[in-house]
UniProtKB/Swiss-Prot annotation:
It catalyses: ATP + H2O + 4 H(+)(in) = ADP + phosphate + 5 H(+)(out). It is a peripheral membrane protein. This is ATP synthase subunit beta. Its EC number is 7.1.2.2.
Amino acid sequence: MNTGHITQVMGPVVDVRFQSGQLPELNNALRVEQKGADQNAVDVNVTLEVALHLGDDTVRTIAMGSTDGLVRGTEVVDTGAAISVPVGEVTLGRVFNVLGESIDLDEPIPADAERSPIHREAPKFEELSTKTEILETGIKVVDLLAPYIKGGKIGLFGGAGVGKTVLIQELINNIAQEHGGISVFAGVGERTREGNDLYHEMSDSGVIKKTAMVFGQMNEPPGARMRVALSGLTMAEYFRDKQGQDVLLFIDNIFRFTQAGSEVSALLGRMPSAVGYQPTLATEMGQLQERITSTKVGSVTSIQAIYVPADDYTDPAPATTFAHLDATTNLERKLSEMGIYPAVDPLASTSRALSPEIVGEEHYNVARQVQQTLQKYKELQDIIAILGMDELSEEDKLIVARARRIQFFLSQNFHVAEQFTGQPGSYVPVKETIKGFKEILEGKYDDLPEDAFRLVGRIEEVVERAKQMV
């Protein structure tokens, strides 16, 4: 057993000296366990991950838990391997921390459960799958204008409080209820309260049986927040590689992964790059994102909430993430202020799947006409603001009327928000979505009041509501 001793503790950074020629490898997990000397002393039980070899038989490590109670001279044991987490069926319905320890007060995970290291290589080129298949979400604005690809990476962009987490919760709910698929949720540096709410909501709806959850929340040290996404991904990879499943990996929030990496980088004494981020930003992001992919056996589809600092899309953190995405869902504060939920910007959201070869001619044409109508309305808004509606031509007035109906019809109630809104949520199949928007564009519902289109599911519900309004 290879042991060393702590020589220095600086917050979450711990230096450990080993005997000559017995340095642990980079990314190895080291364990520190020590009973408190008396009643008032803290019991120490912390895992450290080797980050740097400093020379002089010393390694610099990052703590995955609180370093309270650590003192110089404390014995440290090298486990000889990277941090590993449980994988397989035992993870479903359970909540874990970054080290794969259950934190849900349920039965402990069996000691003989299979485990996998969190640091792994991305799948080789020859193992990757190239076929493109659409993932139906039941959310109209997503399915119509920025459809998700199975095995793709999707980014949910938005500032604070525009609805990223609610959208993620709705996607987990819809995928589990409609597709019966396995999901892994990685809570990276977000609010503990949200994780708690999500767990209870999923338990109530029964979705939890098909979900594994891994949390490293805001109150955790930066080491845990930086590695928790890898822990969740490792669990998802097992279902893909060993069971051939199509798995959904939700990461909330990928910005916190970058933020934690930035903290760790500063603590390790690296020179910062642009806006104070770590110099290894692109490398760290690439190591995580390249493991999220479709292979010939199964797929991992990842949906990542991406906080945009001060709504600045040129910030290096969101900009680096953009490079890896197949589809983006942009949430816009102006829409949420208008009461349009989900507040997805129909013109800024993109997907490489929106092409006639993948979604079909009809879907593509309807989506493009919807975007053209909304774009024309956006251009006319300045004229309306200065001169009023009366100065528009009859043709433009019609475009504005249809655009407003489209804008409202892109909203819908969510199942996971029922307890707040009191309105039942709706799941709308893609065919119904295309039919509804096609008929609005054809002018079939020009005579119905605008408010009938707000927060409904299918077009038939609009007609029903319009009758009640009369």
